Regions:
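Beta-strand-loop-alpha-helix segment that lines the small-molecule cofactor/substrate pocket
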Residues: 1-39
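Short glycine/proline- and charge-enriched loop/turn segments
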Residues: 2, 77-85, 184-191
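C-terminal helix-rich "cap/oligomerization" subdomain common to oxidoreductases
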Residues: 17-19, 53, 136, 210-259
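A general structural signal for well-ordered alpha-helical segments in protein cores
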Residues: 18, 43-44, 98-99, 202-207, ...
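Predominantly a Rossmann-like dinucleotide-binding segment in NAD(P)-dependent oxidoreductases
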Residues: 38-122, 243
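NAD(P)-dinucleotide binding in Rossmann-like oxidoreductases
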Residues: 119-126, 136-204, 222
Length: 259
């Protein structure tokens, strides 16, 4: 159809698919707009500022937690749900927001060691993953994502421990700055009350698209940026597949995702 396209999370399941997508877009002279709406949240944008993040000192520990509920009836709503070919598991479908936000705030990872399991539903994909990782800057991290929590969604947080302080983002959609030890008074003004898990990020997302077409303002998510998030996603699956640590920059695509 040769139309500009907006693609919700995740833009693709494989890095090879991302590359092919952007090649086709370039060939047909159209634009791809991947959606990472939580990047626009006040709390995320606050911690993205150099002055704000520097006040925490050198990053030492990063923790990502998602404890949500997706019962069997959720997967039974459509045949594609809970499949590796069209959906991916808890990390791909739910945890992708937090994985991307962590990478957006903290930078690239050096190693990933992940273990996945299906604990709360009869599906072929994982509904739970735990992992440890190391950033290129030497900081250590843990990731815990599950949709096997019952009977409801509980917490979803990202915390950053630095040499001078601690910051934590949480809420329904990473919309609350819960802790900022350098100045706790800044938390309320950098938090948002949201009616649903979708938050308000899509409004800012569409404004950026409008700016792109109105005055050629550069869209904030580039091909390379998007590719790195999908590459990181695949590294967790590959680590689970080979039962060993992997370097995200030296791996290809998961054998399960998108196949």
């Amino acid at each position: 159809y040769k139309k500009n396209i907006i693609i919700e999370k995740p833009i693709c399941l494989k890095t090879s698919q991302v590359t092919e997508l952007y090649k086709l877009a370039k060939k047909n002279k159209v634009k791809v707009f991947p959606v990472f709406q939580n990047r626009y949240n006040k709390a995320i944008q606050f911690l993205k500022k150099k002055k704000t993040i520097d006040a925490l000192g050198k990053l030492r520990i990063i923790s990502v937690q998602v404890r949500w509920c997706r019962p069997q009836r959720y997967y039974d709503l459509a045949d594609w749900r809970g499949t590796f070919s069209h959906d991916g598991g808890a990390l791909t479908n739910q945890g992708i927001h937090h994985l991307d936000a962590m990478r957006y705030l903290c930078g690239e990872l050096k190693t990933v060691n992940a273990k996945m399991s299906t604990l709360g539903a009869k599906i072929e994909v994982e509904d739970s993953v735990v992992a440890n990782f190391e950033l290129k800057n030497g900081a250590l991290g843990t990731l815990e994502v599950t949709t096997s929590a019952r009977p409801k969604d509980y917490n979803a947080t990202i915390s950053l421990v630095g040499s001078k302080g601690l910051a934590q983002i949480g809420g329904l959609a990473l919309n609350e700055l819960q802790i900022y030890s350098p100045n706790q008074n800044l938390c309320k003004m950098n938090s948002e009350k949201i009616p649903t898990a979708y938050g308000f990020g899509h409004f800012s997302f569409y404004r950026d698209i409008k700016k792109y077409f109105s005055n050629s303002t550069k869209f904030p998510v580039s091909f390379d940026d998007c590719l790195k998030t999908i590459n990181l996603l695949n590294s967790f699956y590959i680590s689970d597949e080979i039962k060993n640590s992997v370097n995200p920059t030296k791996i290809k695509d998961s054998k399960r995702l998108g196949t």
